[in-house]
Amino acid sequence: MLLGVNIDHIAVLRQARMVNDPDLLEAAFIVARHGDQITLHVREDRRHAQDFDLENIIKFCKSPVNLECALNDEILNLALKLKPHRVTLVPEKREELTTEGGLCLNHAKLKQSIEKLQNANIEVSLFINPSLEDIEKSKILKAQFIELHTGHYANLHNALFSNISHTAFALKELDQDKKTLQAQFEKELQNLELCAKKGLELGLKVAAGHGLNYKNVKPVVKIKEICELNIGQSIVARSVFTGLQNAILEMKELIKR
């Protein structure tokens, strides 16, 4: 299984003081040596990664670069100019802390944007909710890749197996008894497996990501139809204590098949 390391949160730390420390390019070099892919989300508001980050990483790093971006003309034109290995189209809201759900596949610009990117020899992935309907739509749209949103799975795992319910970060909608949460967790994991199988049946390559960490990743790794995971925040958080290289290698060991 391949590991794409999302380095957005290193850019968040840099932007907190508006200095070039930590250096995002240095982080990209470490990912290039120890991971399989560099993933970077250039948001419309440029709250963390900047255009020059993408340009420098593509220019100086040999690893594949996976650009996450919304259906924004300015950023799509940047992608067409710089030509990352892959563009993963994601939904985006300015007020959100992180991507809250999968892409709406009924967007009028979506088909045209996919065609433009593919005509420039850029692989296209769609970040979608794990639903059979969205997978079938992704095939119709002729995407080569899909990335299944694992946020709900991760939230359920947290509610079941961590102390988050006793903290300020508890989710009200998951304030339920353990038996109910366990049933929901098992159902969501089965749904991820069903969707991954459907994607592969339709000839799509299947990735997964969002909220995955060192404690919840193993059940997802067992879904053999998923070929790649994109993980960021948990690796960067771990790197505060272990260093980025070790944090990546620890995750690589966990996802080894």
UniProtKB/Swiss-Prot annotation:
The keyword Transferase is assigned to this record: yes
Gene3D superfamilies: Aldolase class I
SUPFAM superfamilies recorded: Pyridoxine 5'-phosphate synthase (SSF63892)
Domain of life: Bacteria
InterPro entries documented for this protein: Aldolase_TIM (IPR013785), PyrdxlP_synth_PdxJ (IPR004569), Pyridoxine-5'_phos_synth (IPR036130)
Residues given in the record as 3-amino-2-oxopropyl phosphate binding sites: N6, R17, G211, G232, Q233
Record-level Gene Ontology MF annotations: pyridoxine 5'-phosphate synthase activity
Keywords tagged on the record: Cytoplasm, Pyridoxine biosynthesis, Transferase
Pathway: Cofactor biosynthesis; pyridoxine 5'-phosphate biosynthesis; pyridoxine 5'-phosphate from D-erythrose 4-phosphate: step 5/5
Active site, per annotation: H41 (proton acceptor), E68 (proton acceptor), H210 (proton donor)
One Gene Ontology term from the biological process aspect of the record: pyridoxine biosynthetic process
Binding site for 1-deoxy-D-xylulose 5-phosphate: D8, H9, R43, H48, T98
Subcellular location field: Cytoplasm
Enzyme class: transferase
One Gene Ontology CC term in the entry: cytosol
Reaction equation(s) it catalyzes: 3-amino-2-oxopropyl phosphate + 1-deoxy-D-xylulose 5-phosphate = pyridoxine 5'-phosphate + phosphate + 2 H2O + H(+)
HAMAP family the record matches: PdxJ
Subunit-structure text: Homooctamer; tetramer of dimers.
Primary role: Catalyzes the complicated ring closure reaction between the two acyclic compounds 1-deoxy-D-xylulose-5-phosphate (DXP) and 3-amino-2-oxopropyl phosphate (1-amino-acetone-3-phosphate or AAP) to form pyridoxine 5'-phosphate (PNP) and inorganic phosphate.
Family the UniProt entry places it in: Belongs to the PNP synthase family.
Protein known as: Pyridoxine 5'-phosphate synthase
